[in-house]
Amino acid sequence: MDKAVTLSEAVASIPNGAHVALSGFAITRATMAFAAEVLRQGIRDLTVSQCVGAMDADLLVGGGAVSRILYGGGSLDRFGRLACVNRAIEEGSIVAEEYSSLSMVFRYLAGALGLPFVPIRSLRGSDVLTHLQEVAPSATAYVDDPFTGDRWLALRPLNPDVAVIQVQMADPEGNAWIYGPRWDNEEQVKAAKRTIVITEQLVPTEIIRRDPERTVIHGFRVSHVVHLPFSAHPTAVYRAYDYDADHIRLYAEAAKTPEGMRAYLDKYVYGVKDHWEYLELLGGMRHLTRLVADPVLGY
């Protein structure tokens, strides 16, 4: 079944108030074009979850689309903090459930396996857990090991309404390859009710079938496939393109203040009709070709 659609069509399938799991990790494989389209369509009151908060989540928060975030902390890596997320937390405009990265993966894993809860040693005795129990008291509990009697922290499973995963290659049926680190993406997909795949390359199914062990997302879990080159810009996609350091610096500086963020959104999100106009605004292929990955190094 051919599931290839436009980005606009895929985003339109997400209702207000949905829980969306994002594949991004700091400044790598972040779902940036997706986040921008969510803002252009005016979708609101989202719950966003990630193992490590990335630039896509910060953009969504900066645009007012998020009411709750579940994450293991996050940053723009060497370029600084997630300024919009941090400001929203300080202002109280979003609820932040902060976990360790491991415990976020465990919550997705529990959801993927259909478990009622998952025991974990992580978080015990930390201020992270103390704060988490204040903002999300139903997310954790304590259980006794029936074999040893030991006391364990238990986490509630996560089952996002949709996982949005940025990949390097997919076929029209939704079978997808991810090169390089996959982090929690497989657990996100298996835990979610459905998945939107955003791919740099769209290839015939015959290509995927030639090397089936590379397939980490299987088509039966996928509702939409979006073929959109440079859709993670300005973040990096291994073996496709490197991060755009100049643009991330521009974003990081703009995001420091509400006024700066509004100006950024007006120019790069609301000032263009779609991802293609955004790429042209950056300078088109004259600008993007310098980011294309070295075929040997992968970046």
Regions found by a protein language model. Name each.
Residues 1-299:
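Conserved alpha/beta enzyme-core scaffold
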